[in-house]
Amino acid sequence: MHIGFFSDQHPATLGGLQVSLELQREHLQRRGHTVTVCAPNSKRTTSPSSAHTNDVHLASIQVGDHSFTLAGARFDATIDLAFANKPPVVCVHVQGDLWGAWNGYRFAARHNLPLIHTMHTNIEVGLPAILPFPRTVFRLLFAAQQRFLDATRVRTIAEYTRAFAERADILIAPSTHFAKHLHGYGIDKEIQVLPTGVDDELIQVLLSEPRAPRARPILLWPGRISQEKRISDFFEAFHQANVDADIHVYGSGVDLAHARKRVAELRLTHRVHFFGAVSHRRVLAAMRNADAVVQSSLGYETQGLTVYEAVSVGTPVILRDRSIAHDLPVEFSHMAADDSIDAFASIIRKFVQLKHESKVRLAASEQFTQSQLTIRLETLYRKAQEIHEHHPTHERFGGNQRAA
Protein backbone atom coordinates (compact mmCIF):
# COMPACT_ATOMS: atom_id res chain seq x y z
CA MET A 1 0.00 0.00 0.00
CA HIS A 2 1.01 3.61 -0.56
CA ILE A 3 -0.10 5.61 2.49
CA GLY A 4 -0.24 9.40 2.49
CA PHE A 5 0.51 10.88 5.91
CA PHE A 6 -0.72 14.47 6.40
CA SER A 7 0.78 16.32 9.37
CA ASP A 8 0.68 19.80 10.89
CA GLN A 9 4.46 19.81 11.46
CA HIS A 10 7.53 18.68 9.50
CA PRO A 11 8.54 15.14 10.56
CA ALA A 12 12.16 16.18 11.16
CA THR A 13 11.29 18.78 13.81
CA LEU A 14 11.29 18.29 17.57
CA GLY A 15 8.23 16.70 19.15
CA GLY A 16 6.54 13.47 20.14
CA LEU A 17 4.22 13.45 17.13
CA GLN A 18 7.15 13.82 14.77
CA VAL A 19 8.93 10.89 16.43
CA SER A 20 5.75 8.87 16.02
CA LEU A 21 5.45 9.70 12.30
CA GLU A 22 8.97 8.53 11.55
CA LEU A 23 8.62 5.35 13.56
CA GLN A 24 5.31 4.48 11.89
CA ARG A 25 6.84 5.18 8.48
CA GLU A 26 9.89 3.03 9.18
CA HIS A 27 7.90 0.01 10.34
CA LEU A 28 5.33 0.27 7.54
CA GLN A 29 8.15 0.39 5.01
CA ARG A 30 9.76 -2.66 6.62
CA ARG A 31 6.53 -4.50 5.85
CA GLY A 32 6.67 -3.49 2.19
CA HIS A 33 4.50 -0.37 2.17
CA THR A 34 5.31 3.12 0.89
CA VAL A 35 4.71 6.21 3.02
CA THR A 36 4.80 9.83 1.84
CA VAL A 37 4.45 12.63 4.38
CA CYS A 38 2.79 15.91 3.38
CA ALA A 39 3.65 18.64 5.88
CA PRO A 40 4.80 22.27 6.12
CA ASN A 41 8.43 23.05 5.43
CA SER A 42 10.51 24.06 8.45
CA LYS A 43 13.71 25.90 9.29
CA ARG A 44 13.97 23.97 12.57
CA THR A 45 14.69 20.43 11.39
CA THR A 46 16.82 18.50 13.88
CA SER A 47 17.33 15.20 12.12
CA PRO A 48 18.63 15.09 8.52
CA SER A 49 17.63 11.43 8.29
CA SER A 50 13.99 12.45 8.72
CA ALA A 51 14.09 14.95 5.84
CA HIS A 52 12.97 12.52 3.12
CA THR A 53 13.37 14.01 -0.35
CA ASN A 54 10.24 12.23 -1.58
CA ASP A 55 8.00 13.94 0.95
CA VAL A 56 5.67 16.80 0.02
CA HIS A 57 6.71 20.02 1.77
CA LEU A 58 4.35 22.99 1.73
CA ALA A 59 5.27 26.66 1.91
CA SER A 60 4.93 27.87 5.49
CA ILE A 61 5.59 30.64 7.98
CA GLN A 62 7.89 29.87 10.90
CA VAL A 63 6.81 31.08 14.37
CA GLY A 64 9.15 29.86 17.08
CA ASP A 65 9.38 26.08 16.94
CA HIS A 66 6.22 25.72 14.86
CA SER A 67 5.41 26.01 11.15
CA PHE A 68 2.10 27.51 10.02
CA THR A 69 0.45 27.02 6.64
CA LEU A 70 -3.06 26.89 5.14
CA ALA A 71 -5.18 24.96 2.65
CA GLY A 72 -7.14 25.93 -0.44
CA ALA A 73 -6.90 25.75 -4.22
CA ARG A 74 -3.22 26.74 -4.42
CA PHE A 75 -2.23 24.07 -1.92
CA ASP A 76 -4.49 21.52 -3.64
CA ALA A 77 -2.62 22.07 -6.90
CA THR A 78 0.79 21.82 -5.22
CA ILE A 79 -0.13 18.61 -3.41
CA ASP A 80 -1.73 16.97 -6.45
CA LEU A 81 1.27 17.80 -8.63
CA ALA A 82 3.67 16.32 -6.08
CA PHE A 83 1.68 13.12 -5.65
CA ALA A 84 1.14 12.73 -9.41
CA ASN A 85 4.74 11.53 -9.78
CA LYS A 86 4.34 8.84 -7.11
CA PRO A 87 2.52 5.50 -6.93
CA PRO A 88 -1.23 5.95 -6.38
CA VAL A 89 -2.17 6.57 -2.75
CA VAL A 90 -4.57 3.92 -1.45
CA CYS A 91 -5.27 5.41 1.98
CA VAL A 92 -4.90 8.86 3.56
CA HIS A 93 -3.77 8.92 7.19
CA VAL A 94 -4.27 12.35 8.72
CA GLN A 95 -1.98 12.85 11.72
CA GLY A 96 -2.74 16.47 12.48
CA ASP A 97 -5.65 18.62 13.57
CA LEU A 98 -5.10 21.92 11.73
CA TRP A 99 -3.74 22.61 8.20
CA GLY A 100 -2.41 19.07 7.93
CA ALA A 101 -5.92 17.80 8.50
CA TRP A 102 -7.55 20.28 6.12
CA ASN A 103 -5.15 19.34 3.32
CA GLY A 104 -5.47 15.63 4.04
CA TYR A 105 -9.27 15.66 4.02
CA ARG A 106 -9.35 17.71 0.84
CA PHE A 107 -6.88 15.37 -0.87
CA ALA A 108 -8.94 12.32 0.13
CA ALA A 109 -12.15 13.98 -1.10
CA ARG A 110 -10.66 14.98 -4.47
CA HIS A 111 -9.37 11.46 -5.12
CA ASN A 112 -12.17 9.54 -3.37
CA LEU A 113 -9.78 7.80 -0.97
CA PRO A 114 -10.39 6.16 2.41
CA LEU A 115 -9.26 8.31 5.32
CA ILE A 116 -8.05 7.51 8.82
CA HIS A 117 -7.57 10.35 11.29
CA THR A 118 -5.35 10.03 14.35
CA MET A 119 -6.32 12.95 16.59
CA HIS A 120 -3.05 13.76 18.32
CA THR A 121 -3.70 17.24 19.71
CA ASN A 122 -5.82 18.67 22.49
CA ILE A 123 -6.47 21.89 20.57
CA GLU A 124 -8.55 23.40 23.35
CA VAL A 125 -5.47 23.45 25.59
CA GLY A 126 -2.65 23.34 23.05
CA LEU A 127 -3.33 26.41 20.92
CA PRO A 128 -3.70 28.90 23.79
CA ALA A 129 -0.43 27.53 25.16
CA ILE A 130 1.57 28.46 22.07
CA LEU A 131 -0.30 31.44 20.57
CA PRO A 132 -1.42 34.83 21.92
CA PHE A 133 -5.04 36.05 21.70
CA PRO A 134 -6.63 32.57 21.77
CA ARG A 135 -10.20 33.81 21.22
CA THR A 136 -9.19 35.45 17.97
CA VAL A 137 -7.18 32.39 16.97
CA PHE A 138 -10.16 30.10 17.56
CA ARG A 139 -12.49 32.35 15.53
CA LEU A 140 -10.05 32.22 12.62
CA LEU A 141 -9.65 28.46 13.07
CA PHE A 142 -13.39 27.86 12.97
CA ALA A 143 -13.79 30.08 9.89
CA ALA A 144 -11.00 28.18 8.15
CA GLN A 145 -12.64 24.86 9.01
CA GLN A 146 -15.91 25.99 7.45
CA ARG A 147 -14.15 27.18 4.32
CA PHE A 148 -11.65 24.40 3.75
CA LEU A 149 -13.89 21.47 4.75
CA ASP A 150 -17.17 22.96 3.50
CA ALA A 151 -18.52 22.53 7.03
CA THR A 152 -21.94 24.07 7.63
CA ARG A 153 -21.43 25.45 11.15
CA VAL A 154 -18.32 25.61 13.33
CA ARG A 155 -18.58 27.78 16.45
CA THR A 156 -17.00 25.57 19.12
CA ILE A 157 -14.15 23.10 19.53
CA ALA A 158 -16.76 20.34 19.74
CA GLU A 159 -18.21 21.31 16.34
CA TYR A 160 -14.70 21.67 14.92
CA THR A 161 -13.78 18.15 16.03
CA ARG A 162 -17.07 16.61 14.92
CA ALA A 163 -16.62 18.09 11.43
CA PHE A 164 -13.54 15.89 11.06
CA ALA A 165 -15.12 12.86 12.71
CA GLU A 166 -18.16 12.93 10.40
CA ARG A 167 -15.90 12.80 7.33
CA ALA A 168 -13.36 10.19 8.48
CA ASP A 169 -13.71 6.48 7.80
CA ILE A 170 -11.86 5.58 11.01
CA LEU A 171 -10.87 7.67 14.04
CA ILE A 172 -7.85 6.89 16.21
CA ALA A 173 -6.88 8.34 19.59
CA PRO A 174 -3.41 7.71 21.05
CA SER A 175 -4.72 6.99 24.55
CA THR A 176 -7.81 5.85 26.41
CA HIS A 177 -8.19 9.13 28.28
CA PHE A 178 -8.07 11.19 25.08
CA ALA A 179 -10.60 8.91 23.37
CA LYS A 180 -12.98 9.63 26.27
CA HIS A 181 -12.24 13.34 25.90
CA LEU A 182 -13.15 13.22 22.19
CA HIS A 183 -16.39 11.34 22.89
CA GLY A 184 -17.21 14.23 25.22
CA TYR A 185 -17.43 16.45 22.13
CA GLY A 186 -20.41 14.44 20.93
CA ILE A 187 -18.56 12.03 18.63
CA ASP A 188 -20.69 8.90 18.61
CA LYS A 189 -18.65 6.69 16.27
CA GLU A 190 -16.13 4.19 17.60
CA ILE A 191 -12.67 5.57 18.34
CA GLN A 192 -9.79 3.13 18.09
CA VAL A 193 -7.06 3.51 20.74
CA LEU A 194 -3.63 3.05 19.18
CA PRO A 195 -0.75 4.50 21.20
CA THR A 196 2.52 5.74 19.80
CA GLY A 197 5.00 2.88 19.72
CA VAL A 198 8.68 2.40 20.40
CA ASP A 199 11.32 0.96 18.09
CA ASP A 200 11.71 -2.71 19.07
CA GLU A 201 15.24 -3.13 17.75
CA LEU A 202 16.60 0.05 19.30
CA ILE A 203 14.99 -0.80 22.64
CA GLN A 204 16.61 -4.24 22.62
CA VAL A 205 20.03 -2.71 21.95
CA LEU A 206 19.60 -0.26 24.82
CA LEU A 207 18.41 -2.97 27.19
CA SER A 208 21.57 -4.95 26.50
CA GLU A 209 23.81 -2.06 27.55
CA PRO A 210 24.84 -1.74 31.22
CA ARG A 211 23.56 1.23 33.19
CA ALA A 212 26.18 3.77 34.18
CA PRO A 213 26.96 4.25 37.89
CA ARG A 214 25.75 7.45 39.54
CA ALA A 215 26.32 9.26 42.82
CA ARG A 216 22.60 9.85 43.38
CA PRO A 217 19.29 9.10 41.62
CA ILE A 218 18.72 10.73 38.23
CA LEU A 219 15.29 12.18 37.43
CA LEU A 220 15.05 12.78 33.69
CA TRP A 221 12.75 15.31 32.02
CA PRO A 222 12.55 14.93 28.19
CA GLY A 223 10.69 17.03 25.65
CA ARG A 224 9.97 20.45 24.21
CA ILE A 225 10.65 23.17 26.78
CA SER A 226 7.57 25.33 26.44
CA GLN A 227 5.07 26.90 28.80
CA GLU A 228 2.43 24.18 28.51
CA LYS A 229 4.95 21.51 29.56
CA ARG A 230 5.35 23.19 32.99
CA ILE A 231 8.98 22.26 33.54
CA SER A 232 9.33 25.12 36.04
CA ASP A 233 6.67 23.43 38.17
CA PHE A 234 8.94 20.39 38.26
CA PHE A 235 11.84 22.53 39.46
CA GLU A 236 9.61 24.07 42.14
CA ALA A 237 8.45 20.65 43.32
CA PHE A 238 12.00 19.27 43.30
CA HIS A 239 13.19 22.21 45.37
CA GLN A 240 10.34 21.71 47.82
CA ALA A 241 10.99 17.95 48.02
CA ASN A 242 14.58 18.64 49.14
CA VAL A 243 15.92 15.27 47.96
CA ASP A 244 19.43 14.05 47.20
CA ALA A 245 19.01 13.58 43.42
CA ASP A 246 19.95 15.13 40.08
CA ILE A 247 17.71 16.39 37.26
CA HIS A 248 18.72 15.79 33.64
CA VAL A 249 16.79 17.82 31.05
CA TYR A 250 16.83 16.68 27.41
CA GLY A 251 15.22 19.05 24.94
CA SER A 252 14.97 22.67 23.90
CA GLY A 253 12.30 25.24 23.16
CA VAL A 254 11.05 28.78 23.54
CA ASP A 255 10.84 28.56 27.34
CA LEU A 256 14.45 27.43 27.82
CA ALA A 257 15.78 30.80 29.02
CA HIS A 258 12.99 31.08 31.58
CA ALA A 259 13.64 27.50 32.74
CA ARG A 260 17.34 28.23 33.27
CA LYS A 261 16.47 31.43 35.12
CA ARG A 262 14.10 29.58 37.44
CA VAL A 263 16.77 26.97 38.21
CA ALA A 264 19.16 29.76 39.18
CA GLU A 265 16.53 31.48 41.34
CA LEU A 266 15.93 28.21 43.20
CA ARG A 267 19.69 27.70 43.57
CA LEU A 268 19.54 24.34 41.84
CA THR A 269 22.26 24.87 39.22
CA HIS A 270 24.43 22.19 40.86
CA ARG A 271 21.59 19.65 40.54
CA VAL A 272 19.91 20.51 37.22
CA HIS A 273 21.79 19.69 34.01
CA PHE A 274 20.57 20.81 30.55
CA PHE A 275 21.67 18.59 27.64
CA GLY A 276 19.82 20.41 24.84
CA ALA A 277 18.13 18.95 21.77
CA VAL A 278 19.86 15.65 20.97
CA SER A 279 19.07 12.60 18.86
CA HIS A 280 16.11 10.43 19.80
CA ARG A 281 18.44 7.49 20.36
CA ARG A 282 20.46 9.49 22.86
CA VAL A 283 17.31 10.48 24.73
CA LEU A 284 16.22 6.85 24.95
CA ALA A 285 19.67 5.85 26.19
CA ALA A 286 19.42 8.56 28.85
CA MET A 287 16.00 7.24 29.85
CA ARG A 288 17.45 3.76 30.20
CA ASN A 289 20.15 5.15 32.48
CA ALA A 290 17.78 7.29 34.58
CA ASP A 291 16.04 6.24 37.77
CA ALA A 292 12.77 7.88 36.71
CA VAL A 293 11.29 9.86 33.83
CA VAL A 294 9.20 12.81 34.99
CA GLN A 295 6.02 14.16 33.35
CA SER A 296 5.04 17.63 34.58
CA SER A 297 2.25 19.03 32.37
CA LEU A 298 -1.43 19.14 33.34
CA GLY A 299 -4.34 18.42 31.01
CA TYR A 300 -2.24 18.99 27.91
CA GLU A 301 -0.95 15.57 26.84
CA THR A 302 -3.14 13.44 24.61
CA GLN A 303 -0.90 10.51 25.40
CA GLY A 304 2.29 9.80 27.30
CA LEU A 305 4.85 9.19 24.56
CA THR A 306 7.89 9.83 26.73
CA VAL A 307 6.53 7.70 29.54
CA TYR A 308 5.66 4.92 27.07
CA GLU A 309 9.30 5.02 26.02
CA ALA A 310 10.43 5.04 29.65
CA VAL A 311 8.57 1.88 30.64
CA SER A 312 9.80 0.22 27.43
CA VAL A 313 13.39 0.60 28.65
CA GLY A 314 12.45 -0.47 32.18
CA THR A 315 12.42 2.97 33.80
CA PRO A 316 9.67 4.05 36.25
CA VAL A 317 7.73 7.27 35.68
CA ILE A 318 6.67 10.08 38.01
CA LEU A 319 3.35 11.44 36.76
CA ARG A 320 1.70 14.73 37.59
CA ASP A 321 -1.18 14.18 35.14
CA ARG A 322 -2.93 11.12 36.56
CA SER A 323 -5.01 10.46 33.42
CA ILE A 324 -1.87 9.33 31.58
CA ALA A 325 -1.47 6.39 33.95
CA HIS A 326 -4.53 4.60 32.54
CA ASP A 327 -2.56 3.00 29.68
CA LEU A 328 0.62 2.29 31.69
CA PRO A 329 1.63 -0.84 33.61
CA VAL A 330 0.74 -0.15 37.25
CA GLU A 331 4.12 -1.15 38.64
CA PHE A 332 5.87 1.64 36.72
CA SER A 333 3.58 4.53 37.71
CA HIS A 334 4.18 6.90 40.62
CA MET A 335 1.36 9.46 40.62
CA ALA A 336 0.88 12.76 42.39
CA ALA A 337 -2.22 12.76 44.60
CA ASP A 338 -3.55 15.94 42.97
CA ASP A 339 -2.48 18.79 40.67
CA SER A 340 -0.70 20.87 43.30
CA ILE A 341 3.02 21.55 43.58
CA ASP A 342 2.84 20.10 47.11
CA ALA A 343 1.54 16.78 45.80
CA PHE A 344 4.15 16.79 43.03
CA ALA A 345 6.89 17.38 45.60
CA SER A 346 5.50 14.63 47.81
CA ILE A 347 5.61 11.95 45.11
CA ILE A 348 9.15 13.00 44.14
CA ARG A 349 10.20 12.69 47.78
CA LYS A 350 8.53 9.28 48.15
CA PHE A 351 10.08 7.99 44.94
CA VAL A 352 13.62 9.01 45.84
CA GLN A 353 13.19 7.41 49.27
CA LEU A 354 11.95 4.24 47.56
CA LYS A 355 15.06 4.21 45.36
CA HIS A 356 17.26 4.34 48.46
CA GLU A 357 15.39 1.40 49.98
CA SER A 358 15.02 -0.83 46.91
CA LYS A 359 17.66 -1.88 44.40
CA VAL A 360 15.27 -3.92 42.26
CA ARG A 361 15.06 -2.90 38.58
CA LEU A 362 11.74 -3.49 36.84
CA ALA A 363 11.62 -5.66 33.73
CA ALA A 364 10.97 -3.57 30.61
CA SER A 365 7.39 -3.51 29.31
CA GLU A 366 6.72 -4.82 25.78
CA GLN A 367 3.30 -3.18 25.60
CA PHE A 368 4.28 -0.41 23.17
CA THR A 369 6.48 -2.17 20.59
CA GLN A 370 5.96 -0.58 17.18
CA SER A 371 6.10 -3.90 15.31
CA GLN A 372 2.91 -5.07 17.04
CA LEU A 373 1.20 -1.69 16.70
CA THR A 374 2.02 -1.62 12.97
CA ILE A 375 0.17 -4.90 12.45
CA ARG A 376 -2.86 -3.31 14.12
CA LEU A 377 -2.46 -0.22 11.92
CA GLU A 378 -2.42 -2.35 8.75
CA THR A 379 -5.68 -3.93 9.88
CA LEU A 380 -7.22 -0.48 10.34
CA TYR A 381 -6.10 0.60 6.85
CA ARG A 382 -7.89 -2.43 5.36
CA LYS A 383 -10.95 -1.75 7.49
CA ALA A 384 -11.00 1.87 6.28
CA GLN A 385 -10.96 0.66 2.68
CA GLU A 386 -13.92 -1.62 3.36
CA ILE A 387 -15.88 1.15 5.07
CA HIS A 388 -15.08 3.57 2.27
CA GLU A 389 -16.40 1.22 -0.40
CA HIS A 390 -19.84 1.47 1.20
CA HIS A 391 -19.66 5.18 2.09
CA PRO A 392 -17.51 7.06 -0.44
CA THR A 393 -15.96 10.40 0.51
CA HIS A 394 -18.22 12.49 -1.72
CA GLU A 395 -21.26 11.32 0.27
CA ARG A 396 -19.81 12.93 3.43
CA PHE A 397 -17.90 15.86 1.96
CA GLY A 398 -19.97 18.38 0.02
CA GLY A 399 -18.84 21.23 -2.16
CA ASN A 400 -16.11 21.81 -4.69
CA GLN A 401 -12.85 21.55 -2.78
CA ARG A 402 -10.84 23.10 -5.59
CA ALA A 403 -12.80 26.32 -5.30
CA ALA A 404 -12.04 27.04 -1.66
Predicted features and spans:
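Membrane-proximal helix-turn-helix segments that form the acceptor-binding/catalytic region
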Residues: 140-170
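Acidic donor-binding loop of glycosyltransferase active sites
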Residues: 169, 288-302
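Carbohydrate-associated surface elements
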Residues: 177, 197
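Nucleotide-activated donor-binding/catalytic signature segment of Leloir-type glycosyltransferases, i.e.
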Residues: 258-278
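Short hydrophobic beta-strand element within catalytic cores of glycosyltransferases
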Residues: 307, 312, 316-319
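Conserved acidic donor-binding segment of nucleotide-sugar-dependent glycosyltransferases
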Residues: 321, 330-342, 349-355
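A charged, aromatic-enriched C-terminal amphipathic alpha-helix characteristic of glycosyltransferases
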Residues: 353-392
